[in-house]
Amino acid sequence: MKRRLLIMFLLGCLLPFAVQAQHGTFRFAQITDIHFSPNNPNPTEDLLRSVAQINAIDSIDFVLVTGDITEEGDRTTMLKVKETLDLLKAKYYVILGNHETKWSDSGCTAFGEIFGGERFEFEHKGILFLGFNSGPLMRMAYGHVVPQDIRWMTEEMDKFGKDKPVILVTHYPLLDGDVDNWYEVTDAVRPYNIRLFIGGHYHRNRDLRYDGIPGILMRSNLRDKDGKPGYGIYDITKDSILVYTQRIGEPKKQWAAFSLTQPYYDRNGKAEKYPDFSVNTEYPNVKEQWVVQTGAGIYCSPAIEKDKVFIGDDMGYLTCYALKNGKKLWNF
């Protein structure tokens, strides 16, 4: 019995190293906050310089493009961004930023048509990468991650394996004041082996924590005060993630590092804080009659006609519920 317990103890100690050994070493780049504009040639020149320098580095396995690829989110400019990104020798993966959603002239449909979708998923040498939209979903609103994307993330990580390393890719930081339901995301992904969130939006390097989970924001690709564009480089080693800034024509500079084996947060814990819902108690005469979880985002008021409630969602469905008890009657 003692021998069996010793073997089990040793297996428990060795398991993290076994998981660690399953991934290989590699390097990838991150370009963010490109801000192409029909009225300003500088962002185009900046991206072309970054693409040329990335193409000159044989060790880049792929490129993450983390949002705000345009200034105003219009279809014509997004097509020009794609033409430029297509010059990359390495495969690239792209997500939306707030500039693609706030001022979209297509109701946020053009991005998916041009780039093949609003999120991405791939596994590279033992690490799972998941990229998703962090909003906003209405003009000038806070960022928001829709329920179907949160559900998609957890389903993908379940298939991949809870103990295997995952890197999540967004535009916004998952912070109060940036994303209104940040806590829903961090609570949902906490049980998994999240090694890092990668994002942009702030136009400068930031090393953050999202309810304990490490998060990186990379500088904008736009030229800095010295007139130099720049992007991020990530080296994945056997036990670490090394983060660099790469200014055009200069050696890369490391400014952050993260362990691939050591824990950063309690996988059984909760968000550090939650929104204040005390306003719901200010009207004691108003009583909750029923609640339905639709599994989709709803950004408009329901319509009531006689004994029925009609609700439209961001997946394109109109659903009818019974006013009395919330029973789903139909949808299309």
Which residues fall in each region the model found?
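Bacterial Sec-dependent N-terminal signal peptides
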Residues: 1-23
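N-terminal active-site segment of His-dependent metallophosphoesterases
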Residues: 17-80
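Active-site-proximal beta-strand elements of phosphoester/diester hydrolases
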Residues: 25-38, 126-136, 167-169, 214-219, ...
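Active-site glycine-centered loops adjacent to acidic/histidine catalytic or metal-binding residues
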Residues: 33, 67-68, 97-98, 171, ...
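Extended active-site neighborhood of metal-dependent phosphoesterases/phosphodiesterases
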Residues: 75-165, 184-196, 206-218, 224-237
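Binuclear metal-dependent phosphoesterase catalytic core
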Residues: 213-279
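Extracytoplasmic/lumenal domain signature
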Residues: 265-299, 303-332
